[in-house]
């Protein structure tokens, strides 16, 4: 008995020693402290940072000269939209691409589609996507990875281009005057929180019913009743979507439309089949087709599918599109090195290395692998400045943060920033080389919904 006790004590002591070896010991702490040699410059920096933001002190004064705002190729843009305090950048961007086409086609002075109309059905469809996902996984335990992901993401106001195609192809479009913004459409946080909370409650009820042996047809009835509750919550916060409306083109004779007839008459794009998403993700193999599981806005919609390309290939496609006066859906890691006052995206905007006395040496691939960078915001790519050799020098996007933000509502990015923090564009297939389109014929490599590279754009 004593032998066993002695062994147990020795084993416990060994584990404790092993744990201590991985911690910060007193000796190690002394070494760390001694490695820091305070200098007069350090004291000045500490004093400054005590009452000033890091970005203010890291601002690179050598990069403060006025930057060139002229571009060799630019798509006509009329009016800046504002998503306010919402994560609907993906929707504003998609609609801005379409309104540019309508303005050019009909010579309009202005045009804006109702973001609120599309957003209403986006939220309803996402609610159904969640509830049906819960039914489909009802036989799996709560700690299953997919079940866990569903309950963590019942719905959000963010998204990407597949949401634009999913919603418009099914529900059409209306002018902004037919369904205007509300407080909750412009400030989505509380509404999304309440609907998400209710959906999680409904999700548990559906799992309990399935576990009790309720038949699929009865689960469908329960889901329909639940969606009725969500519909009411959406009507109270966003208003009820119009089914018909009257509208005239350039002061002509007014005509009655449905959202679908309006879309088909004035645009009629096949958003599902005429566009292709292109990604620059150096952490994965190029010239391959990828599909993100369950990453769609409708249960009966299409999973997000894209072709992964080197950055130079994407630039060639983007340049071809802009030269032909066609805007593009574009997404990037907008918060990196953004000088919001000037509306300039440039890795040379801030010199964090000189301020902190160290280097930040990860490349794009390493930043993706370590969850340090990823697409966070969608905007409309609408201009490029080319040198005499036809190579890009800088780019411009039309943003959806209002006309007072950035450079007159736009952001200008250097080509270097484009290389490092641009992640995807959506191009019309007519601008994409045949060899790239052929990649779409491959069986896509399926990635899980929780892959960190594919969070919603907000």
Please give the residue ranges for each predicted region.
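Stable alpha-helical elements in mature extracytoplasmic
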Residues: 85, 93-94, 98, 160-169, ...
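Papain-like cysteine protease catalytic cores
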Residues: 115-245
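N-terminal regions that are enriched for targeting/export leaders
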Residues: 21-79
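Bacterial Sec-dependent N-terminal signal peptides
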Residues: 1-22
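Second-shell loop/turn segments in exported
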Residues: 75-87, 149-155, 301-308, 317-318, ...
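Structural recognition of the beta-strand scaffold that forms the well-ordered cores
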Residues: 91, 117-120, 166, 175-178, ...
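Post-signal peptide N-terminal segment of secreted/secretory-pathway proteins
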Residues: 65-137
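Active-site signature of cysteine proteases
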Residues: 213-458
């Amino acid at each position: 008995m004593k032998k066993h006790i002695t062994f147990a004590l020795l084993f416990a002591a060994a584990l404790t020693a092993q744990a201590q070896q991985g911690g910060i010991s007193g000796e190690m702490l002394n070494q760390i402290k001694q490695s820091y040699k305070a200098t007069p410059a350090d004291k000045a920096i500490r004093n400054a940072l005590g009452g000033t933001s890091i970005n203010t002190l890291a601002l690179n004064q050598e990069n403060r000269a006025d930057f060139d705002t002229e571009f060799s190729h630019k798509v006509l843009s009329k009016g800046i939209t504002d998503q306010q305090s919402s994560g609907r950048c993906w929707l504003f961007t998609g609609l801005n691409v379409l309104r540019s086409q309508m303005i050019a086609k009909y010579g309009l002075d202005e045009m804006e589609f109702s973001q609120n109309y599309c957003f209403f059905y986006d939220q309803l469809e996402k609610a159904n996507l969640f509830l049906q996902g819960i039914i489909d996984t009802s036989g799996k335990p709560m700690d299953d990875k997919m079940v866990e992901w569903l309950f963590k993401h019942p719905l959000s106001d963010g998204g990407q281009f597949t949401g634009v195609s999913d919603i418009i192809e099914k529900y059409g479009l209306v002018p902004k005057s037919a369904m205007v913004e509300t407080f909750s459409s412009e400030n989505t946080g509380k509404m999304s929180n309440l609907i998400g909370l209710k959906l999680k409650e409904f999700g548990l009820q559906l799992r309990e019913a399935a576990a009790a042996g309720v038949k699929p047809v009865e689960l469908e009835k329960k889901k329909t009743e639940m969606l009725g509750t969500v519909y009411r919550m959406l009507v109270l916060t966003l208003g009820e979507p119009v089914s018909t409306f009257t509208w005239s083109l350039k002061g002509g004779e007014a005509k009655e439309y449905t959202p679908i007839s309006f879309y088909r008459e004035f645009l009629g794009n096949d958003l599902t089949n005429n566009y292709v998403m292109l990604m620059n993700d150096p952490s994965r193999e190029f010239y391959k087709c990828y599909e993100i599981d369950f990453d769609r806005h409708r249960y009966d919609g299409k999973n997000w599918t894209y072709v992964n390309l080197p950055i130079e290939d994407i630039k060639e496609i983007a340049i071809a599109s802009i030269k032909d006066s066609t805007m593009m859906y574009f997404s990037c890691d907008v918060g990196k090195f953004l000088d919001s006052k000037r509306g300039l995206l440039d890795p040379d905007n801030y010199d964090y290395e000189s301020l902190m006395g160290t280097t930040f040496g990860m490349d794009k691939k390493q930043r993706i692998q370590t969850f340090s960078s990823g697409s966070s915001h969608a905007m409309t790519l609408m201009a490029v400045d080319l040198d005499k050799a036809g190579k890009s020098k800088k780019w411009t996007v039309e943003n959806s943060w209002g006309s007072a933000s950035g450079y007159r509502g736009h952001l200008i990015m250097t080509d270097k920033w484009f290389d490092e923090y641009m992640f995807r564009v959506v191009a019309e297939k007519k601008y994409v080389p045949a060899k790239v389109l052929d990649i779409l014929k491959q069986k896509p490599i399926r990635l899980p919904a929780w892959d960190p590279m594919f969070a919603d754009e907000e």
